[in-house]
A protein has these predicted regions:
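Active-site-proximal loop/helix segments of hydrolase catalytic cores
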Residues: 10, 16-19, 108-128, 132-133, ...
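Charged helix-capping and loop-helix junction motifs
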Residues: 40-43, 72-80, 112-118, 148-159
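Binuclear metal-dependent phosphoesterase catalytic core
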Residues: 87-91, 157-165, 169, 176-215
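Core catalytic region of metal-dependent phosphoesterases/phosphodiesterases
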Residues: 6, 11-90
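Short, conserved loop/helix-junction motifs that constitute active-site signature segments
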Residues: 18-20, 47-52, 74-77, 124-125, ...
């Protein structure tokens, strides 16, 4: 199964120069620019033009419509499977999606580090194959520059849960500077941020293959 991974498009989805075909298109959050229902409808119209047989979306901290008017936002997103602390199995591959990130200023889907996030990550089933979260785990694709010094701002509790799982892949975004592929044990980790740190949609979609588990 070929996964095509994007994230953090911030309503600039039409500026992505080329989106490879694949079995499942995954958007790891921050699909919206202003966070409005109109943004959701525009994003959905664009998804309809893409050839992928399956499309999965999780929300991010800019995606206010999914937090403030969740029923209306989900109704508007007819072209994708929306995951919020929920999962779906596609052709034998088990996906789980979650929007939460550690608190930073006043954005959507944010929780305090510690117990609140720990409880969310404990909802991830042990048999998950592909995890989709908006934010990164601590120390992987999560470095931002604070003055002259880099700082890892990912979630410690998410890293702890990943260490307990046998994931094939973990797909996220949120930290634009961390775009790229990483490896943690036997797990492929993908920071699929489409927009760079200047909010230009310059980063290419990342493609990877996963396989149904036997037995």
């Amino acid at each position: 199964m070929k996964l095509v991974c994007i994230s953090d498009t911030h309503s600039l989805h039409r500026r992505i120069p080329d989106i490879p075909d694949g079995d499942v298109l995954i958007h790891a959050g921050d699909c919206l620019g202003q966070g409005t229902l109109e943004n959701v409808r525009d994003f959905n119209d664009w998804l309809e033009t893409l050839p992928h047989r399956h499309k999965i979306v999780v929300a991010g901290n800019h995606d206010w419509a999914f937090q403030e008017t969740p029923e209306l936002a989900r109704e508007a997103l007819t072209e994708a499977i929306y995951l919020e602390d929920s999962g779906v199995e596609i052709e034998g591959v088990r996906f789980w999606g979650s929007p939460w990130t550690p608190v930073f200023m006043n954005w959507a889907f944010m929780l305090q580090r510690g117990e609140s996030l720990y409880e969310k990550w404990q909802l991830i089933p042990d048999n998950t194959d592909v995890l989709i979260t908006h934010g990164p785990p601590k120390g992987i694709g999560d470095e931002v520059m604070m003055g002259l010094k880099g700082q890892n701002v990912g979630c410690e509790q998410l890293l702890g849960r990943i260490q307990q799982l046998s994931l094939q892949a973990h797909i996220f975004g949120h930290i634009h500077e961390g775009y790229g592929g990483y490896r943690f044990g036997k797990t492929d980790l993908i920071n699929a941020s489409t927009c760079n740190e200047r909010y230009l949609a310059d980063n290419a979609p990342i493609v990877l293959d996963v396989h149904p588990q036997k037995g």
